[in-house]
Amino acid sequence: MAGTRRKSLQNRQVGSLLIFLCISVGDATTIRYSVAEEMESGSFVANVAKDLGLEVGKLAARGARLVSEGNKMHFRLHRKTGDLFVKEKLDRESLCGKADPCVLHFEVVLVEPLQSFRAEVRVFDINDNAPVFLNKEPLLKIPESTPLGSRFPLQSAQDLDVGLNGLQNYTLSANGYFHLHTRFCSHGPKYAELVLNKPLDREEQPEVNLTITAVDGGSPPKSGTAHIHVVVLDVNDHVPQFSRLVYRAQVSENSPNGSLVATVTAVDLDEGTNKAITYSLAQNPEAILKTFQIDPQNGEVRLRGPLDFEAIETYDIDIQATDGGGLSAHSKVLVEVVDVNDNPPEVMVSSVSSPLPEDSPPQTVVALFTIRDRDIRVGGKVTCFLREDLPFVIKPTFGNSYSLVTDRSLDREEVSGYNITIVAMDTGPPSLSAETMIEVLISDVNDNPPIFREDSYILTVRENNSPAVFIGKVHAEDLDLGENAQITYSLLPPKNGDLSVFAYISINSGNGKLYALRTMDYEAIQDFQFVVKATDGGFLSLSSQVTVRVVVLDDNDNRPMILYPLQNGTLPCNDLVPRSAEAGYLVTKVVAVDGDSGQNSWLSYHLLKATDLGLFSVQRQNGEIHTLRQISERDPMMQKLIILVQDHGQPALSTTVSLNILLVDGFSEPYLQFQDPTKHSRKVNPSTKYLVISLVILSFLFLLSVIVIFIIHVYQKIKYREKFTIQEHFYDDCNFSNNLVQGQGNGSLSRPCPYEMCSATGTGNSEFRFLKRFMPNFPFPHATGEIKMEAGSSLPPNSDRNKSQRLEGHDQVSDDYM
């Protein structure tokens, strides 16, 4: 029955408190609510979305959640409606004990973007606990001689409620000896004292039974009772006397059990057993009895349990001294707990944004956290910092809440993630600290273009290759990740006028391998270049370019080509050599070129066959033909030579040329001597010109018919000469005898020899005539003859035989190149 009334009373109290449920917004970041304790699970508290000024749907869209500062969350949030409900029945006494007000703190955290709001709920007390006496039947022994007005402190009742619902008053049952006096304690609950109104008489009434009632201030009030049994003792004239009415002591909260707190002393003037004093902690709450103990013989008060300044700062201990006759006296020991820095700060992370894009701007919020230090006075000031130098900083938001934000730009390619250690340190002494590690991963953004390994590539392909042959590979790397690092290769179209690369080269877009689409010809294209583009697969793709040069390697696929002597198959190619020529005489020179390059174009000359192998030799490097010995009368007049011209390719290719050499008589011996044209003046002697003109005029008058044939023959040879870029200049008004042909030196002689050879066309006889000066010197209008060699000639590079020479005494006209 009593339980039913109690439950009904609680429900009425809950209802009355719900009427006064208050919601307040203290500032822009803190919302406050009030609820009554003992509300059932699921009870409505408030609408958070409305109080925060947010649309209801945004709570769910932004992933709203509650984060408690303690170990347990007592509320739950309905994301769709924004309603805040009680998660489980709230018991203010278990949550906050005797603390008043009782406030529960939590945070409402929103993401995308990251945002938090501080909230607190004050739990109001209801009168759900009645006062309780720990000792239901206390025993008091009072001598009959106790004077009137003597006070006997009683054990205080315990009421878990606070405020008006807590213990308010004591009442005593009606009796003829005592009345009740309520005392107030500054650091504890109210307690009562029995005050003797009437002298006791053991013989009249040896025992007195009393009932004490403790009443709280609830509506309706609750109460608790205890039955006091008073035993009247025989006369004991003196009561113990304490040296002090109040003892004061200070004890550090980290003092170990057994530490001495204080020593109380009392004396009794009686004799015998009435003088013996026993000390006890008789009338004290349970919290004191669990924390302190007293030696009954010497009065030493020592620690029995741990102290916690953050829980209880002071203790008011009632000490009772009882003599052997049953008389007792009371004194107080006020114990002040000294705060020490024994609680390290606590770092409580409420939200972390991970992974974090690497292009996040500075001041981007990464995490939200709160720091709490249970020490109030000592070490209560806390600082926090990052252990390492990282691109993050800590910024205070409000109160003891902080945010971790980016301080500078991030780069995933350098650091893909961070283990951020937050250090919280109080001021001590001694200074205590705590660490919390937050892992933040960095997500990739396409901010790096592909990079080729080389600044440019040079690839080689041998001519006459097979189509689709692999010629090389380009490779680029991208420092990004995933699709941002996937590279596609392509060929860029050529610029105007450049070679169309698409006709020659193809590229594998996936791996950058290059292939030749057609057969290369070194003689047509020696090299070409194009541009390869590498593009990554990012949303906003990045690219880079590299130039690739393809060098075509030469194959030995061209035989040497003979430029001189001409092999036309109609006219014999004859060179004249005087029989008086000495050993080493330069007969002629074979000139050849090769369409290949490098070693494949290096030519060497060999005497393959000859009428007399011991008469002539061919220089291997330049093709000059010299006599090995002096010509004798026994040597046949016609000497036939077959010269082999061979390149240095692998395998080597070769060409042969046939050459006829006529051994003739009649050359003047003095003029067979070799003369260096560089010793002569570059300026042609006028007397020589006059002499030549005179001879030409005489020859023209006598041999007109021969001149016509000669002109036709010269015209044909000029055509051949222009074909091989060998320039010749003839005298327009030169006249020769009708049976003479004028020539310059021998064969491919690069030096003009100052002699004239006249050969009779009709017979095998030949005659050498020295032209003496017979006319005065005067200028001649025609230039001397020139021989120009191709760059591919095998003549020695230091030879000056390919230079134009001016002869002193006559002009050079070569019949061997005609």
Swiss-Prot record:
One GO cellular component, as annotated: plasma membrane
Domain of life according to the entry: Eukaryota
SMART domains in alphabetical order: CA
Glycosylation sites recorded in the entry for this protein: N169, N209, N257, N419, N568
Membrane topology, Cytoplasmic segments: 713-818
Parts of the chain that traverse the membrane: 692-712
Topology relative to the membrane: Single-pass type I membrane protein
Major subcellular location class: membrane
InterPro entries in the record: Cadherin-like_dom, Cadherin-like_sf, Cadherin_C, Cadherin_CS, Cadherin_N, Protocadherin/Cadherin-CA
Protein name, entry field: Protocadherin beta-1
UniProt organism field: Homo sapiens (Human)
